[in-house]
C-alpha cells in the first residue's frame, strides 16, 4: 500500500525527520489559503501514487496566491498522466502546498526490501533528485548499498559510515545519522517495504531536510497497521482492484488479454509464467485463495470479465480445501449471469475433479477442458491467436 507524499512526510515528522512546512489543500479555496500563509511564494504538488509529477506539470513553483489558485483549478478533480501512470493517469484529489526551501545540495536515501536476499537494504547516494537506478547504471561508484543483517539491525556506526559516504561531516553528519536511524525505525515499526527520501537536501541555511518522501506499507501487515489502512486512498487504485479487495480477492490488473482465475498465489504466478512461455499475455493476477466458496468464485469471475481487455479466460484450480465441483458450479453460474461468450479453458486437479469436469462438459457455454497447465495455456493462446 502506497502513501501520498503528505502522508509520508507526516509519518517522517513523527520520527523526528525534518520536512518543509506544508499544508494540505483539497479545493481551490484551500489552496489559496495555504499559499497565503507563505505570502504567495510556495510549491504546489499534486498528490498521486506515482512519480514523474514534475515533468508532467504536477509540481509547480508559484509566486502569488492567484498563481496557486490557477494551478489548483488545473489539477484538482482531474487526472494527471506521468511516465509512471500509463495513459489513463491518476486522479488528483489533493495538493500539498509547501514553503520554498533554498537548497545547497541534494542526496538520495532509502531503505527497501531486497527480495533476492530476503533482507532490508539501505541505498544512499550523494546525487539526489534523480532516478537512482539511472545513477547506479551510469556511475555505480556513486551509489552505496548496505544489506542489513536482521540479527544485528542498522546501528549507529552504519549510519555514520553512510553519512561520510554522502560527504557530510560535523553537525550535518550527526544530523544525517539521526535521520538514517529514524528512517530505519519507521521502516520496522510501520511494516514498510520502502521508505525513501529523494532528495535529502542540505539547505542554504545548513540544515538537513527531506524534500520529498515515499513510503510503501506491506499489504500483508495492514491487519496490524490500522492507522496506515485508514490512510488508504482508493481513488489511486483501479476500480476493479478496489472491488476485489473488498471481497478479499487478490487482483492486479495487467496489460494482456487473457484473464486468469487461480487459487493460491504461487499457482497464480506459475500460471502467468506458463502463459507467457506459450506466447500469451495475462490480463491480470487473480488469486481467489485456498478456501474460497462458490460465491467468492462467482464474484472473482465477474470482476475478471468486467475488464474490457479480456478476450479469453484461463482457469487453473487445485482442489485441496476447495472442491472442484463447487468451483465448476461457480464458474457456470458466473458465466451465465454475465452472459459470457468468451472462450474459457479450464484445468483442475484435486478433490472431486471428475465431478467438476463432468459439470463443465455438460454446459452449453464456450468452455473447454485440459488436463495439464501447459496444455491449458497453449489451448487458450491458440484459440485467441490461431497462428500461434
From Swiss-Prot:
The record's annotation in PROSITE patterns points to: ATP_GRASP, SUCCINYL_COA_LIG_3
GO molecular function of the protein, one example? magnesium ion binding
Catalyzed reaction equations: succinate + ATP + CoA = succinyl-CoA + ADP + phosphate; GTP + succinate + CoA = succinyl-CoA + GDP + phosphate
Keywords, comma-separated and alphabetical: ATP-binding, Ligase, Magnesium, Metal-binding, Nucleotide-binding, Tricarboxylic acid cycle
Q: Hey, which pathway is this one from? A: Carbohydrate metabolism; tricarboxylic acid cycle; succinate from succinyl-CoA (ligase route): step 1/1
Top-rank EC class of the record's enzyme: ligase
- The positions annotated for binding substrate are 263, 320-322
Q: Does the keyword Ligase apply?
A: yes
Annotated ranges, domain ATP-grasp: 9-243
Subunit comment: Heterotetramer of two alpha and two beta subunits.
Q: Which NCBIfam families match?
A: PRK00696.1, sucCoAbeta
Protein name in UniProt: Succinate--CoA ligase [ADP-forming] subunit beta
Give the organism, scientific name: Syntrophotalea carbinolica (strain DSM 2380 / NBRC 103641 / GraBd1)
**Gene name for this UniProt entry:** sucC
Amino acid at each position: 500500500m502506497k502513501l501520498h507524499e503528505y502522508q509520508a512526510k507526516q509519518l517522517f515528522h513523527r520520527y523526528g525527520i525534518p520536512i518543509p512546512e506544508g499544508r494540505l489543500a483539497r479545493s481551490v479555496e484551500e489552496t489559496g489559503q495555504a499559499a497565503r500563509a507563505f505570502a504567495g511564494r510556495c510549491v504546489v504538488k499534486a498528490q498521486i501514487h506515482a512519480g514523474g509529477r514534475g515533468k508532467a506539470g504536477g509540481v509547480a513553483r508559484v509566486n502569488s496566491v492567484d498563481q496557486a489558485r490557477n494551478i489548483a483549478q488545473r489539477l484538482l478533480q482531474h487526472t494527471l498522466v506521468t511516465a509512471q501512470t500509463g495513459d489513463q493517469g491518476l486522479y488528483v484529489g489533493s495538493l500539498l502546498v509547501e514553503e520554498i526551501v533554498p537548497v545547497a545540495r541534494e542526496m538520495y536515501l532509502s531503505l527497501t526490501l531486497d527480495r533476492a536476499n530476503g533482507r532490508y537494504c539501505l541505498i544512499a547516494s550523494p546525487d539526489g533528485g534523480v532516478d537512482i537506478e539511472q545513477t547506479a547504471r551510469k556511475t555505480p561508484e556513486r551509489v552505496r548499498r548496505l544489506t542489513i543483517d536482521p540479527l544485528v539491525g542498522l546501528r549507529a556506526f552504519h549510519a555514520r559510515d553512510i553519512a561520510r559516504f554522502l560527504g557530510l561531516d560535523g553537525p550535518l553528519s550527526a544530523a544525517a545519522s539521526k535521520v538514517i536511524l529514524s528512517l530505519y525505525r519507521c521502516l520496522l515499526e510501520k511494516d514498510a517495504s520502502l521508505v525513501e527520501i529523494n532528495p535529502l537536501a542540505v539547505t542554504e541555511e545548513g540544515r538537513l531536510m527531506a524534500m520529498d518522501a515515499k513510503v510503501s506499507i506491506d499489504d500483508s501487515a495492514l491487519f496490524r497497521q490500522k492507522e496506515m489502512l485508514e490512510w488508504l486512498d482508493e481513488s489511486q487504485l483501479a476500480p476493479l482492484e478496489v472491488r476485489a479487495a473488498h471481497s478479499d480477492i487478490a487482483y492486479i490488473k495487467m496489460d494482456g488479454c487473457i484473464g486468469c482465475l487461480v487459487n493460491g498465489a504461487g499457482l497464480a504466478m506459475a500460471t502467468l509464467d506458463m502463459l507467457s512461455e506459450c506466447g500469451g499475455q495475462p490480463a491480470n493476477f487473480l488469486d481467489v485463495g485456498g478456501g474460497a466458496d462458490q460465491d467468492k468464485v462467482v464474484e472473482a469471475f465477474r470482476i475478471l470479465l468486467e475488464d474490457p481487455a479480456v478476450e479469453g479466460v484461463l482457469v487453473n484450480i487445485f482442489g485441496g480445501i476447495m472442491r472442484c465441483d463447487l468451483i465448476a458450479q461457480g464458474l457456470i453460474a458466473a458465466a451465465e449471469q454475465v452472459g459470457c461468450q468468451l472462450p474459457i479453458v479450464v484445468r483442475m486437479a484435486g478433490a472431486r475433479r471428475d465431478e467438476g469436469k463432468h459439470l463443465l462438459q455438460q454446459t452449453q457455454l464456450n468452455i473447454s477442458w485440459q488436463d495439464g497447465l501447459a496444455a491449458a495455456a497453449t489451448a487458450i493462446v491458440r484459440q485467441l491467436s490461431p497462428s500461434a
